[in-house]
């Protein structure tokens, strides 16, 4: 019997960081990044730190010019959104091929960063800042 490998045209991945959530689609292309309908450079204010973060999973596998990244992201600021996109792209690459999982995991692209804003407690001015202490 002839077994055929099914190949999809679109690979999905969801990433989260702080309060940001990114839905990432990988489409065979030439490395264009589109975030919320704008170019990746424009959306991330041409910040090389954020741009490199978004491209990191593809660069780890050497696929930066093989797939276009289409992103719908909301919540948080640019840093949180860039890291959410990174995680979403890494998850989409795992969907592309199970062999991609190991190198992405060793680079840390698949792990969710649990750091988030600590809540404010009553009796304090901020999460940990206490009012000035007076002995007398």
UniProtKB/Swiss-Prot annotation:
One of its GO terms (biological process) is translation. GO terms for molecular function: RNA binding; structural constituent of ribosome. GO terms for cellular component: cytosolic small ribosomal subunit. It comes from the Bacteria. InterPro entries: Ribosomal_Su5_D2-typ_SF (IPR020568), Ribosomal_uS9 (IPR000754), Ribosomal_uS9_bac/plastid (IPR023035), Ribosomal_uS9_CS (IPR020574), Ribsml_uS5_D2-typ_fold_subgr (IPR014721). The keyword Ribonucleoprotein applies. It holds the Pfam family Ribosomal_S9. Residues 117-136 have a biased composition (Basic residues). Keywords: Ribonucleoprotein, Ribosomal protein. The keyword Ribosomal protein applies. Residues 97-136 are annotated as: Disordered. Belongs to the universal ribosomal protein uS9 family. This is Small ribosomal subunit protein uS9. It comes from Prochlorococcus marinus (strain MIT 9215). The gene is rpsI.
């Amino acid at each position: 019997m002839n077994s055929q490998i099914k190949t999809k045209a679109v690979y999905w991945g969801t990433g989260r960081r702080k309060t940001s959530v990114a839905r990432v689609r990988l489409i065979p292309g030439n490395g264009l990044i589109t975030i919320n309908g704008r170019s990746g450079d424009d959306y991330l204010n041409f910040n090389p730190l954020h741009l490199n973060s978004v491209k990191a999973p593809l660069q780890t596998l050497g696929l930066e010019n093989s797939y276009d990244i289409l992103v719908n992201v909301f919540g948080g600021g640019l840093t949180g959104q860039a890291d959410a996109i990174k995680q979403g792209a890494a998850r989409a690459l795992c969907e592309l091929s199970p062999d991609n999982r190991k190198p992405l995991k060793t680079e840390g692209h698949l792990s969710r960063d649990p750091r988030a804003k600590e809540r404010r407690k009553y009796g304090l001015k901020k999460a940990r800042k206490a009012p000035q202490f007076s002995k007398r």
